[in-house]
Amino acid sequence: MIKNTGGTVISMPFGKNIITFNSNRHFFRGENQQYLKSLPSLRRKQEGKSKYECELIKAIAVMRSFQFLKFIWKIDVVPFWEAKLSDINIDALAQHYGFDTCLLDLTNDFRTALFFATCKYDYKTDSYRPLTKKDIEATENSKYGVIFHSPNWVLDYLNGGSFEWHMHRLNNPDKGPYSFYSGYLGGMAFQIGYQPLMRCHHQSGYIMPMMNATPLQNDNRFEKLRFLQSEELSNRVYEMMDKGKKIFPHEGIGKSLDILRTIQKAVIFSEDDLLYAYDYGVVDKKMFPTIDNLRKAITALQVDGKFVSIQKDEIDYPISTSALQEINDEYNGRNLLDVIGNMIHQYPEQRWYREQRCIDIYGKLI
């Protein structure tokens, strides 16, 4: 099928055209200990909160992701990619670069899942390291790693996983596009495809929206593979994956890590950010009938001891000219088609759409 051919442009129901990589027919997710619930970071922050609080927490997460997009747009390769190759999947990028979202990571590469199931993230260095004896023996749950597995025809939007979803929407006048935060896309896996920043395709990444979906532990579409952790296994996998570089590459965006972490904790937003959250975040319109209602509620909220504020002007996260040049130097000059196979398969209307995006971004075809 053409949909399984790497380099094919596919239009997704969330409104993005993505360039696919080859499908391996299976989905995996690795976790380095047993958890009671495997849920996206946003859902974990909403646990135990009222529906009112959950809506505000969601709006803040969406605004932070939007600010992330505005920041990375300063990097030459990001607007160029959107102008010439495919749409930027900001939610997937935000998920892979440390922002709270309603998305859960999956991969179609077993080794990638095994790496995440046997190694530990180091927040200080933004990298992974092998498990130590202390890590493994910390609790009864940390003695075991878990890998979730499902055939991709069960979950994949491109390979049968969307059949029931399409049947339910045959007579639905709302044809989308659908926000990940709407709940309409829950429980299906979507290929992230190739993106200008590298983590997503290095990890053969898929995302599963879980705004309302059940935790993986209770999802009978997944089998759960539990194994005993050991330092020997962890070190062996760590070395096999080139100390994590094969799936967690050291790239230009890492030079702005401090800025990304500032955005991840942001409490000051623009009116444009708020409008985006109100619309794209699918804020409950019965609870907040107008954007003014949302503004009033969210500015009364404290996050980590600080009140949220909304201002008219855009929030700028400055980066020095030299630092930005260093980042650009790591991306500019690369043949962006190399990793794709030097060919993009697309329909004429998709090519026309890309040309229009180029004109929107640069004012002309380049």
Language-model segments: what does each one mean?
Residues 1-366:
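Catalytic-core elements of nucleic-acid end-processing and repair enzymes
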